[in-house]
């Protein structure tokens, strides 16, 4: 039986600590690792793909059981290129991360990290999106031991069709109280736009936002991580509201 093959990507870029530390740990623990990641940070780009310019694949590093490539594209591009171009056969599992910053609740709609894992699930490959609390300790070995156990469990048990796992990890230095299987919480952003002027007098804007968390209970990823639990949320990317389908089917609408 050969080594377990892993495709790693992220939205923080190919030189980010999270992806490089995870790649090294998995390589040292018997996995065959391929990294395909954006050449620069592409955070909050959601599920964008590149259609109107060429994609360029650049080898960064190659050694036994570890190959690293950068592309001038998005996280979802990276998954597609990794599967269709770089790897000889589909990986056993796809991991997006480890992201510097949590991706919880409705944040996942904006997240390049989560969208890359969704892209993997679209291929029918088990996929994880993994995020660590911002400025958390990427050298914490307990985090990698946990992730290895989770990978092994996913490969042993499998995941439901069209489902991925969104994993959010508190900073271990603050203490970890355990692991919870959670549901998505709700976060909204109150956007503010700061107006400035360039040297030619033309105005431009920086967008900033204040987070508001609403109606979150103990079952949610948001509350669980706040209380020191690692959150594992199964995400199914069928966005259909089936209750609304039943209701709308009774509407009388004619052409």
Curated annotation (Swiss-Prot):
It is an enzyme of class 3 (hydrolase). The keyword Magnesium does not apply. Keywords: Cytoplasm, Hydrolase, Metal-binding, Nucleotide-binding. A divalent metal cation binds at residues 11-12, 43, 99. Binds 1 divalent metal cation per subunit. It catalyses: a ribonucleoside 5'-phosphate + H2O = a ribonucleoside + phosphate. Its cofactor is a divalent metal cation. Gene3D superfamilies: Survival protein SurE-like phosphatase/nucleotidase. The keyword Nucleotide-binding applies. Pfam families: SurE. One of its GO terms (cellular component) is cytoplasm. Its EC number is 3.1.3.5. GO terms for molecular function: 3'-nucleotidase activity; 5'-nucleotidase activity; exopolyphosphatase activity; metal ion binding; nucleotide binding. It is found in: Cytoplasm. InterPro entries: SurE (IPR030048), SurE-like_Pase/nucleotidase (IPR002828), SurE-like_sf (IPR036523). Transmembrane segments: none annotated. Nucleotidase that shows phosphatase activity on nucleoside 5'-monophosphates. Belongs to the SurE nucleotidase family. This is 5'-nucleotidase SurE. The lineage of its organism: Bacteria, Bacillati, Bacillota, Clostridia, Thermoanaerobacterales. The gene is surE.
């Amino acid at each position: 039986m050969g080594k377990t093959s892993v495709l790693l990507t992220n939205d923080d870029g190919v030189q980010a600590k999270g992806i490089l530390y995870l790649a090294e740990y998995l390589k040292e623990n018997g996995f065959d690792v391929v990294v395909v990641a954006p050449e620069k940070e592409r955070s909050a780009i959601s599920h964008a793909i590149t259609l109107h310019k060429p994609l360029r694949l650049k080898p960064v590093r190659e050694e036994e059981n570890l190959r690293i490539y950068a592309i001038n594209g998005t996280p979802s591009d990276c998954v597609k290129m990794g599967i269709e171009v770089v790897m000889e056969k589909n990986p056993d599992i796809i991991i997006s991360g480890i992201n510097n910053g949590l991706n919880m609740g409705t944040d996942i709609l904006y997240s390049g990290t989560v969208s890359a894992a969704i892209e993997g699930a679209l291929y029918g490959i088990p996929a994880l999106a993994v995020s660590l609390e911002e400025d958390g300790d990427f050298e914490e070995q307990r985090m990698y031991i946990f992730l290895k156990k989770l990978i092994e469990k996913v490969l042993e048990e499998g995941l439901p069709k069209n489902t991925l796992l969104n994993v959010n990890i508190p900073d271990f230095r603050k203490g970890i109280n355990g692991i919870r299987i959670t549901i998505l919480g709700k976060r909204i952003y109150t956007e503010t736009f700061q107006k400035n002027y360039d040297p030619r007098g033309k105005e431009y804007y920086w967008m900033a936002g204040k987070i508001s968390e609403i109606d979150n209970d103990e079952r949610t990823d948001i509350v669980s991580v706040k209380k020191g639990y690692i959150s594992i949320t199964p995400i199914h990317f069928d966005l259909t509201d089936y209750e609304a389908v039943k209701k709308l089917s009774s509407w009388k609408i004619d052409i």
